[in-house]
Amino acid sequence: MVKKKIAISCGDIQGIGLELILKSHKEVSVLCEPLYLIHSELLGRANQLLTNAYEVKPLNAIAINSPLPSFNSSTIGKVSAQSGAYSFESFRKACELADDKEVDSICTMPINKLAWQQAQIPFVGHTDFLKQRYKEHQIIMMLGCPKLFVGLFSDHVPLRAVSQLIQVKALVQFLLAFQKSTQAQIIQVCGFNPHAGEEGLFGEEDEKILKAIQESNQTLGFECFLGPLPADSAFAPNKRQITPFYVSMSHDVGLAPLKALYFDESINVSLNAPILRASTDHGTAFDIAYQNKANNKSYLNAIKYLSQRL
């Protein structure tokens, strides 16, 4: 069977991304044909910081159109506008290759959002960039593993803004797009307010969620969406036995239980996009950068997910 070609953006080089690339290359090469979007000298420098623990020569790396950031023992673990600009250009190039069908999919290493901001990148993160690049598609952030997947109706927005986003029409569009992308037959939807609103006692948002669920099920012709469920008990073991697929109105309500249960193995997937993209479900981990402590399970699971897609 022909291996899938996967473009791998480098993420913020001051974090654990390059350690993950170097320590996982042999396993990744069994699963796919990786193409690393980074200057090869930066990989060599990363290996030196890791006491030359890994083999660099076999890696297929292509230089990107960006100045090399400062990168040495005094810069690692620190926010840098240079590194932010470099990580963005690596990601942008990966998307370009996927658009041009030169690769089958892309896998992204973690970036530092503050570094992007300091580099004056006008996007909060990977998903925000994809939403702007592919405006005609409703890009959905889904995180998880086969035991539990959570789709986020809102992602990197202030919690105070989520209430205004919960509108029946927008939520119906989201629910139907999520079901189409996952092909899940049962999806549990978390409520927004305590006790899922207690029939309107604690706010009107959950009444809107209920109406969106009813309209979505009617459109599908079967009872796919269940809820809104009180979020404080939605992820109880007996609930997770019903289905691994959930929808959360806000970022932390869905991701707190996911990361408590499956932090090391979860991945981040961009659904409903014209290109296939997956990522690690963790950040740059500046505090352990270049200490040979990075856990590569999430990265390998992201590669496995991409390599198994049609």
From Swiss-Prot:
Principal location: cytoplasm
Annotated EC: 1.1.1.262
NCBIfam families in the cross-refs: pdxA, PRK03946.1
Pathway(s) the chain acts in: Cofactor biosynthesis; pyridoxine 5'-phosphate biosynthesis; pyridoxine 5'-phosphate from D-erythrose 4-phosphate: step 4/5
HAMAP family reported for this sequence: PdxA_Epsilonprot
Protein name, UniProt field: 4-hydroxythreonine-4-phosphate dehydrogenase
Family: Belongs to the PdxA family.
Localization per record: Cytoplasm
Gene Ontology cellular-component terms listed: cytoplasm
InterPro entries: PdxA_epsilonprot (IPR037539), PdxA_fam (IPR005255)
A Pfam family: PdxA
Summary of subunit composition and partner proteins: Homodimer.
Superkingdom: Bacteria
GO term, biological process aspect, one: pyridoxine biosynthetic process
GO molecular function, one term: zinc ion binding
Keywords, alphabetical: Cobalt, Cytoplasm, Magnesium, Metal-binding, NAD, NADP, Oxidoreductase, Pyridoxine biosynthesis, Zinc
Protein's job: Catalyzes the NAD(P)-dependent oxidation of 4-(phosphooxy)-L-threonine (HTP) into 2-amino-3-oxo-4-(phosphooxy)butyric acid which spontaneously decarboxylates to form 3-amino-2-oxopropyl phosphate (AHAP).
Residues that, per the record, bind substrate: H126, T127, K259, N268, R277
Entry binding sites for a divalent metal cation: H156, H195, H251
Underlying gene: pdxA
Other notes: The active site is located at the dimer interface.
Cofactors (names): Zn(2+); Mg(2+); Co(2+)
Catalytic function, reaction form: 4-(phosphooxy)-L-threonine + NAD(+) = 3-amino-2-oxopropyl phosphate + CO2 + NADH
